[in-house]
Amino acid sequence: MVFRAGIGRIGLIRGLATQAAEVSATRYKSFKIYRWNPDTPAEKPRMQEYKVDLNKCGPMVLDALIKIKNEQDPTLTFRRSCREGICGSCAMNIGGRNTLACLCKIDQAENKDVKIYPLPHMYVVKDLVPDLTNFYKQYKSIQPYLQKASKPADGREHLQSIADRKKLDGLYECILCACCSTACPSYWWNNEQYLGPAVLMQAYRWMVDSRDGAGAGRREQLQNAMSVYRCHTIMNCTRTCPKGLNPGKAIAEIKKALAFA
């Protein structure tokens, strides 16, 4: 029995040594990244390849981008801030899907390239940085703040029941990363007039807030052919949302509110 136990320990040690050797070996992964520099407008956009050792890199795509920028190419440009899916800064198209680089895990298969582009159908500032000027202008247009004609008689904050507060769940969590809007074909075709899934979900968030007193005006603002009705329920918005929200459902609720107002 002692002999067998000894053999077991030797086997365990050999197994651990083998695992350590495997971990210490380099595992290079190819990242092909969209590059464009406005300072050299004559040069066309291109895909540039970088190799990253996965054994010396964090698990997320943003970790790889930061490693590339710090160690290989300081000219690589992208947005990032919180690194935990809260700010929405690092939204980009990874492997054909709009998502947040800080929440997107690196595929560990070394034979599969990771292709990274800026959010689609947006003007590009540089490399992976989209121009969100129009997106934020549209967000501003819905007046995303509490509007009340009068203050509470007792001077306190506007109270809200638990049931009314629950109506905001699945709406207020939006981080305005623009993943959903830039995945929407209707927004690609009409982004100057169609507000897009992200902005419309926020419009609905204020429409159903029991503390707000501008519901009629908010509905009237959306009562036209372009603001809401360009949504054709393709539902790319819901599929791509990195926060697991459902902009498509919010837009459907707006249409119902306008139809039965």
From Swiss-Prot:
> How cofactor binds (record note)?
Binds 1 [2Fe-2S] cluster. Binds 1 [3Fe-4S] cluster.
Q: Any idea where the 2Fe-2S ferredoxin-type domain is?
A: 31-122
Record-listed [3Fe-4S] cluster binding positions: C184, C231, C237
Q: State the Pfam families in the record.
A: Fer2_3, Fer4_17
Say yes or no: keyword Lipid metabolism present. Answer: no
Q: What is this protein called?
A: Succinate dehydrogenase [ubiquinone] iron-sulfur subunit, mitochondrial
- EC number(s) per UniProt? 1.3.5.1
Q: In which pathway does it act?
A: Carbohydrate metabolism; tricarboxylic acid cycle; fumarate from succinate (eukaryal route): step 1/1
Q: Which residues bind a ubiquinone?
A: W189
The reply to whether ATP-binding figures as a keyword in the UniProt entry is no
Residue ranges of domain 4Fe-4S ferredoxin-type in the record: 164-194
Q: Name one GO molecular function term.
A: succinate dehydrogenase (quinone) activity
Can you tell me which residues bind [2Fe-2S] cluster?
C82, C87, C90, C102
Where in or outside the cell it occurs: the entry states: Mitochondrion inner membrane
Name the gene that codes for it: SDH2
Q: What class of enzyme is it?
A: oxidoreductase
Q: What topology does the record note for this protein and the membrane?
A: Peripheral membrane protein
- List cofactor names only: [2Fe-2S] cluster; [3Fe-4S] cluster; [4Fe-4S] cluster
Q: What does this protein do?
A: Iron-sulfur protein (IP) subunit of succinate dehydrogenase (SDH) that is involved in complex II of the mitochondrial electron transport chain and is responsible for transferring electrons from succinate to ubiquinone (coenzyme Q).
> What UniProt keywords are attached to this protein's entry?
2Fe-2S, 3Fe-4S, 4Fe-4S, Electron transport, Iron, Iron-sulfur, Membrane, Metal-binding, Mitochondrion, Mitochondrion inner membrane, Oxidoreductase, Transit peptide, Transport, Tricarboxylic acid cycle
Q: Name one GO biological process term.
A: respiratory electron transport chain
What are the binding positions for [4Fe-4S] cluster in this chain? Answer: C174, C177, C180, C241
